Amino acid sequence: MTDWFARPVLHVTNVEASLRFYIDRLGFTSPWRYEEDGKVHVAQVERQGCALILADTWPEKIGKGLMFISLNLEPAAQVAALNALRTELEATGAPVKEGSWGYRLLVVDDPDGNQLFFNYPSESASGKSDGDET
């Protein structure tokens, strides 16, 4: 069976400005871009197996994206990795905040209002591990 690969689209006002944010603030790279008349209209950004498409082609959809990004690690390692990610992103000036959707989230809003949710599935919204009784 063939593995599937998804690349969700985030709709943005200005792809070049969004590329600067995703690369400079969030640590992504950009393997390709589609340009027309000297302007970038679509680009892919990647980081550690996570691929997203940035596009300015549907203005009515700008800022309405929501992506859940999960780390494929054991729970303790995942918590440590997300805490390290938060420290890294805050050092670049990325707008990082706490969130909750039944469990703790690390939330980043891009310049257009699209949201990236990095989840801590091994913890409840209170910050306690699922098996923690204290």
Q: Where on the chain are the PLM-derived regions?
A:
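N-terminal beta-strand motif that seeds the catalytic metal site of vicinal oxygen chelate
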Residues: 1-19, 67-71, 119-134
